[in-house]
Swiss-Prot record:
Belongs to the thiamine-phosphate synthase family. 2-[(2R,5Z)-2-carboxy-4-methylthiazol-5(2H)-ylidene]ethyl phosphate binds at residues 139-141, 171, 191-192. GO terms for molecular function: magnesium ion binding; thiamine-phosphate diphosphorylase activity. Condenses 4-methyl-5-(beta-hydroxyethyl)thiazole monophosphate (THZ-P) and 2-methyl-4-amino-5-hydroxymethyl pyrimidine pyrophosphate (HMP-PP) to form thiamine monophosphate (TMP). GO terms for biological process: thiamine biosynthetic process; thiamine diphosphate biosynthetic process. The keyword RNA-binding does not apply. The lineage of its organism: Bacteria, Bacillati, Bacillota, Bacilli, Bacillales. This is Thiamine-phosphate synthase.
Amino acid sequence: MFNQSYLNVYFICGTSDVPSHRTIHEVLEAALKAGITLFQFREKGESALKGNDKLVLAKELQHLCHQYDVPFIVNDDVSLAKEINADGIHVGQDDAKVKEIAQYFTDKIIGFSISDLDEYAKSDLTHVDYIGVGPIYPTPSKHDAHTPVGPEMIATFKEMNPQLPIVAIGGINTSNVAPIVEAGANGISVISAISKSENIEKTVNRFKDFFNN
Protein backbone atom coordinates (compact mmCIF):
# COMPACT_ATOMS: atom_id res chain seq x y z
CA MET A 1 0.00 0.00 0.00
CA PHE A 2 1.31 3.42 -0.97
CA ASN A 3 2.27 5.98 1.64
CA GLN A 4 3.22 9.43 0.39
CA SER A 5 6.10 9.55 2.88
CA TYR A 6 7.80 6.97 0.64
CA LEU A 7 8.54 9.90 -1.68
CA ASN A 8 10.62 11.87 0.85
CA VAL A 9 14.05 10.66 -0.26
CA TYR A 10 13.56 8.65 -3.44
CA PHE A 11 16.77 7.20 -4.89
CA ILE A 12 16.92 6.24 -8.58
CA CYS A 13 19.88 4.31 -9.93
CA GLY A 14 21.25 1.91 -12.54
CA THR A 15 24.68 0.50 -13.27
CA SER A 16 25.70 3.46 -15.44
CA ASP A 17 25.01 5.92 -12.62
CA VAL A 18 27.64 4.70 -10.15
CA PRO A 19 31.35 5.64 -10.11
CA SER A 20 33.77 3.05 -11.50
CA HIS A 21 35.29 2.39 -8.06
CA ARG A 22 31.93 1.32 -6.59
CA THR A 23 29.33 -1.29 -7.38
CA ILE A 24 25.65 -0.48 -7.51
CA HIS A 25 25.17 -2.91 -4.61
CA GLU A 26 27.57 -0.88 -2.45
CA VAL A 27 25.96 2.42 -3.36
CA LEU A 28 22.43 1.15 -2.76
CA GLU A 29 23.25 -0.45 0.57
CA ALA A 30 24.93 2.74 1.79
CA ALA A 31 21.85 4.71 0.76
CA LEU A 32 19.53 2.21 2.44
CA LYS A 33 21.54 2.31 5.66
CA ALA A 34 21.36 6.10 5.58
CA GLY A 35 17.58 6.02 5.29
CA ILE A 36 16.32 6.47 1.73
CA THR A 37 12.55 5.93 1.61
CA LEU A 38 12.08 4.49 -1.89
CA PHE A 39 14.31 2.98 -4.59
CA GLN A 40 13.80 2.84 -8.34
CA PHE A 41 15.88 0.53 -10.51
CA ARG A 42 16.47 2.47 -13.74
CA GLU A 43 18.77 0.56 -16.07
CA LYS A 44 19.26 2.83 -19.10
CA GLY A 45 21.98 3.80 -21.57
CA GLU A 46 24.27 2.13 -24.06
CA SER A 47 25.98 -0.03 -21.43
CA ALA A 48 22.74 -1.05 -19.70
CA LEU A 49 22.34 -4.67 -18.69
CA LYS A 50 19.74 -6.67 -20.57
CA GLY A 51 18.00 -10.01 -20.38
CA ASN A 52 19.06 -12.39 -17.64
CA ASP A 53 21.86 -10.11 -16.41
CA LYS A 54 19.34 -7.35 -15.76
CA LEU A 55 16.94 -9.82 -14.14
CA VAL A 56 19.60 -11.19 -11.77
CA LEU A 57 20.71 -7.70 -10.74
CA ALA A 58 17.13 -6.57 -10.19
CA LYS A 59 16.50 -9.51 -7.86
CA GLU A 60 19.69 -8.79 -5.90
CA LEU A 61 18.84 -5.11 -5.46
CA GLN A 62 15.24 -5.94 -4.59
CA HIS A 63 16.47 -8.30 -1.88
CA LEU A 64 18.68 -5.52 -0.49
CA CYS A 65 15.76 -3.09 -0.39
CA HIS A 66 13.52 -5.55 1.39
CA GLN A 67 16.16 -6.12 4.06
CA TYR A 68 15.65 -2.45 4.94
CA ASP A 69 11.87 -2.44 4.37
CA VAL A 70 12.19 -0.03 1.45
CA PRO A 71 9.87 -0.55 -1.55
CA PHE A 72 11.55 -1.54 -4.82
CA ILE A 73 10.26 0.19 -7.96
CA VAL A 74 11.11 -0.74 -11.55
CA ASN A 75 11.45 1.97 -14.20
CA ASP A 76 9.45 1.35 -17.41
CA ASP A 77 10.07 -2.41 -17.71
CA VAL A 78 6.63 -3.92 -17.16
CA SER A 79 7.70 -7.51 -17.84
CA LEU A 80 10.58 -7.27 -15.35
CA ALA A 81 8.35 -5.73 -12.70
CA LYS A 82 5.87 -8.57 -13.15
CA GLU A 83 8.52 -11.30 -13.15
CA ILE A 84 10.14 -10.26 -9.89
CA ASN A 85 6.90 -9.08 -8.28
CA ALA A 86 8.26 -5.58 -7.75
CA ASP A 87 6.58 -3.27 -5.27
CA GLY A 88 5.72 -0.90 -8.07
CA ILE A 89 6.53 0.57 -11.44
CA HIS A 90 7.29 4.06 -12.72
CA VAL A 91 6.44 4.99 -16.30
CA GLY A 92 6.82 8.05 -18.47
CA GLN A 93 4.66 9.72 -21.08
CA ASP A 94 6.02 7.50 -23.85
CA ASP A 95 5.72 4.20 -22.02
CA ALA A 96 2.84 1.75 -21.74
CA LYS A 97 -0.51 3.26 -20.85
CA VAL A 98 -1.12 3.51 -17.12
CA LYS A 99 -4.61 2.03 -17.46
CA GLU A 100 -3.18 -1.15 -18.98
CA ILE A 101 -0.42 -1.34 -16.37
CA ALA A 102 -2.92 -0.96 -13.56
CA GLN A 103 -4.59 -4.21 -14.64
CA TYR A 104 -1.39 -6.07 -13.74
CA PHE A 105 -0.45 -4.01 -10.70
CA THR A 106 -3.70 -3.68 -8.79
CA ASP A 107 -1.98 -3.65 -5.40
CA LYS A 108 1.30 -2.03 -6.46
CA ILE A 109 2.72 1.49 -6.47
CA ILE A 110 2.32 3.25 -9.82
CA GLY A 111 4.32 6.38 -10.56
CA PHE A 112 3.97 8.56 -13.65
CA SER A 113 6.18 11.31 -15.10
CA ILE A 114 4.68 14.68 -15.98
CA SER A 115 6.71 17.67 -17.15
CA ASP A 116 4.21 20.40 -17.91
CA LEU A 117 0.58 21.49 -17.96
CA ASP A 118 -0.07 19.99 -21.39
CA GLU A 119 1.05 16.55 -20.23
CA TYR A 120 -1.00 16.93 -17.07
CA ALA A 121 -4.12 17.86 -19.03
CA LYS A 122 -3.94 14.76 -21.25
CA SER A 123 -2.98 12.31 -18.49
CA ASP A 124 -5.41 9.92 -16.82
CA LEU A 125 -4.28 9.81 -13.20
CA THR A 126 -7.05 7.50 -11.98
CA HIS A 127 -4.67 4.64 -11.25
CA VAL A 128 -1.59 6.72 -10.39
CA ASP A 129 -0.26 6.86 -6.82
CA TYR A 130 2.14 9.74 -7.41
CA ILE A 131 3.56 11.87 -10.19
CA GLY A 132 7.20 12.71 -10.80
CA VAL A 133 7.51 16.33 -11.88
CA GLY A 134 10.53 17.69 -13.68
CA PRO A 135 13.18 18.25 -14.57
CA ILE A 136 13.08 20.91 -11.88
CA TYR A 137 16.65 22.01 -12.61
CA PRO A 138 19.10 21.16 -15.43
CA THR A 139 20.18 17.54 -15.08
CA PRO A 140 23.21 15.58 -16.32
CA SER A 141 21.54 12.20 -15.74
CA LYS A 142 19.00 12.31 -18.56
CA HIS A 143 20.23 13.37 -21.99
CA ASP A 144 16.67 13.49 -23.37
CA ALA A 145 15.28 15.59 -20.54
CA HIS A 146 12.80 18.40 -21.10
CA THR A 147 13.55 22.07 -20.42
CA PRO A 148 13.71 22.65 -16.64
CA VAL A 149 10.34 23.69 -15.22
CA GLY A 150 11.45 24.97 -11.82
CA PRO A 151 9.80 24.48 -8.41
CA GLU A 152 6.97 26.72 -9.62
CA MET A 153 5.52 23.83 -11.61
CA ILE A 154 5.09 21.83 -8.41
CA ALA A 155 3.24 24.70 -6.78
CA THR A 156 0.99 24.95 -9.84
CA PHE A 157 0.09 21.26 -9.76
CA LYS A 158 -0.52 21.40 -6.00
CA GLU A 159 -2.94 24.29 -6.49
CA MET A 160 -4.78 22.29 -9.15
CA ASN A 161 -4.81 19.03 -7.19
CA PRO A 162 -3.79 19.46 -3.52
CA GLN A 163 -4.21 15.75 -2.71
CA LEU A 164 -1.94 14.48 -5.51
CA PRO A 165 1.39 13.20 -4.14
CA ILE A 166 4.27 14.81 -6.04
CA VAL A 167 7.96 13.97 -6.12
CA ALA A 168 10.37 16.41 -7.74
CA ILE A 169 13.10 15.19 -10.08
CA GLY A 170 15.96 16.66 -12.07
CA GLY A 171 19.18 18.36 -11.04
CA ILE A 172 18.37 18.23 -7.34
CA ASN A 173 21.10 18.45 -4.72
CA THR A 174 21.29 19.36 -1.05
CA SER A 175 21.74 23.06 -1.82
CA ASN A 176 18.60 23.54 -3.94
CA VAL A 177 15.97 21.47 -2.12
CA ALA A 178 14.40 24.25 -0.04
CA PRO A 179 12.39 25.89 -2.87
CA ILE A 180 11.04 22.45 -3.82
CA VAL A 181 9.81 21.80 -0.29
CA GLU A 182 8.32 25.28 -0.09
CA ALA A 183 6.45 24.61 -3.35
CA GLY A 184 4.70 21.69 -1.68
CA ALA A 185 6.52 18.61 -2.98
CA ASN A 186 6.09 15.43 -0.95
CA GLY A 187 9.65 14.43 -1.70
CA ILE A 188 12.65 14.58 -3.99
CA SER A 189 14.02 11.93 -6.33
CA VAL A 190 17.71 11.97 -7.14
CA ILE A 191 20.26 9.96 -9.06
CA SER A 192 23.78 11.41 -9.09
CA ALA A 193 23.38 13.46 -5.89
CA ILE A 194 23.45 10.15 -4.02
CA SER A 195 25.15 7.72 -6.43
CA LYS A 196 28.18 9.97 -6.87
CA SER A 197 28.28 11.41 -3.37
CA GLU A 198 31.56 11.16 -1.47
CA ASN A 199 29.55 10.72 1.72
CA ILE A 200 26.22 9.03 1.00
CA GLU A 201 25.14 8.95 4.65
CA LYS A 202 25.65 12.69 5.03
CA THR A 203 23.88 13.45 1.75
CA VAL A 204 20.85 11.29 2.52
CA ASN A 205 20.55 12.67 6.04
CA ARG A 206 20.67 16.21 4.69
CA PHE A 207 17.82 15.39 2.30
CA LYS A 208 15.85 13.72 5.10
CA ASP A 209 16.16 16.83 7.27
CA PHE A 210 13.99 18.76 4.81
CA PHE A 211 11.07 16.38 5.36
CA ASN A 212 11.39 15.62 9.07
CA ASN A 213 9.95 18.89 10.30
